[in-house]
């Protein structure tokens, strides 16, 4: 993982900036590597967003239970935008879009991991929708153990899809989370505290 940075504020259009305008060719650009706790604190601003974050943490727990504990996740979609006040939408987000880049556990193959947790690797649109409805995560898993050519192709695809809004074509940023489970329990505690109005 690259060094962690602070989550940049939404711009006037309610999207994350894709680059640091003051240093446009610096490494401080999307996908911004951020801590899971910062992610939870920043986006747990409504009951619906808390539900989605809970689903994301549950999805990560399922990945960890399947042995996928090394890698990173790209998070994007309407969840990363201030859609509640956007004139074109003015609604809460429905889910969070997540691409998970993962290392297979030692001695495991893609086939054995998928056989042990088939719901995490949907092969049909219906299975994908079932996963999304369960976790409120539009999930796309990608193994880091495949060919270099495929990894570059998939990374370029998702950066191209997520680097712009689909309806306005405006350039936007997104975030990167470490897949390791070390921060999940603290992040869940923060989310619970936010949900109950307590102090973590």
PLM regions with names:
Residues 98:
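Structural signature of FAD isoalloxazine-binding scaffolds in flavoprotein oxidoreductases
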